[in-house]
Design a protein with these regions (language model features):
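Basic, helix-initiating cap at the start of DNA-binding domains
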Residues: 1-43, 47, 58
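C-terminal peripheral helix-coil segments that are non-catalytic and often amphipathic
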Residues: 1-4, 85, 125, 129, ...
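Short amphipathic alpha-helix in the helical subdomain of ABC transporter nucleotide-binding domains
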Residues: 10-13, 124, 146-154, 173, ...
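Short amphipathic alpha-helical segment with a characteristic S/N-K-E followed by hydrophobic residues
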Residues: 17, 32, 55-60, 67-71, ...
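Hydrophobic alpha-helical connector segments
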Residues: 71-100
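Helix-loop "lid/cap" segments that line or gate small-molecule binding pockets
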Residues: 88-94, 102-111, 181-188
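Amphipathic alpha-helical packing segments from all-alpha helical-bundle domains
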Residues: 92-100, 104, 114-140
Length: 197
């Protein structure tokens, strides 16, 4: 039975459990996260957790999905505005609560095929779909050159920002995201490629 088919926990209690899950994930990583640890952090019984989530995979994926916010596709009328709203809004890369557990997520993706599949489908999938819509609308408005391979542009912004955060040690601020959009993404998407020799 999937998490969406299981009974909901009343009131804010479910949100508290999901927040505790992200805290434990950030503290100990996915491999060492247990339902016991989440229950203790959330001051809940394990039975409460198991009534809603079948295992730690379903709990962690639900917590990550919830932290990303609803699958909203911004439509500001410009590619720049849409990218800023998508990446800097709730659940975006400028949200410290979203980025904090990400190191644990990257490790889990590399080590656990079931986690990787669930993460790509449930957590990343809605953001990828939103990004695809944004880029396709930009192409239809003439903001992106016609020969641009949108499948390369869609993940580029997140890839650059996450590299700067996890490899270079920078904070994922709206200023960093603005600079990446204005100095890398938009020029690359609009500039004509150099002729090949």
């Amino acid at each position: 039975m999937s998490p969406t088919e299981r009974p909901r926990i009343e009131g804010d209690r479910e949100l508290e459990i999901l927040a505790a899950t992200l805290e434990v994930l950030g503290d100990v990583g996915y491999d060492r996260l247990t339902m016991d640890a989440v229950a203790a952090r959330a001051k809940a019984s394990k039975a409460t957790l198991y009534r809603r989530w079948t295992n730690k995979l379903s709990l962690v994926i639900d917590a990550l999905h919830h932290s990303k916010g609803p699958a909203h596709v911004p439509d500001t009328g410009t590619l720049r505005g849409d990218l800023m709203e998508l990446v800097c809004g709730m659940g975006g890369l400028a949200d410290p609560e979203t980025v904090a557990p990400f190191a644990s997520v990257l490790t889990a993706i590399a080590r656990d095929a079931d986690f990787a599949e669930a993460f790509r489908t449930e957590v990343v999938g809605p953001k990828v779909a939103a990004s695809q819509q944004i880029w396709e609308r930009a192409r239809q408005r003439g903001e992106v050159r016609g020969d641009a391979d949108l499948s390369l542009f869609e993940p580029a912004l997140a890839g650059i920002v996450l590299h700067r955060v996890f490899v270079m040690g920078e904070q994922p601020t709206p200023d960093l995201i603005t600079r990446v959009i204005d100095q890398i993404i938009l020029p690359a998407a609009t500039r004509q490629p150099a002729p090949s020799h």
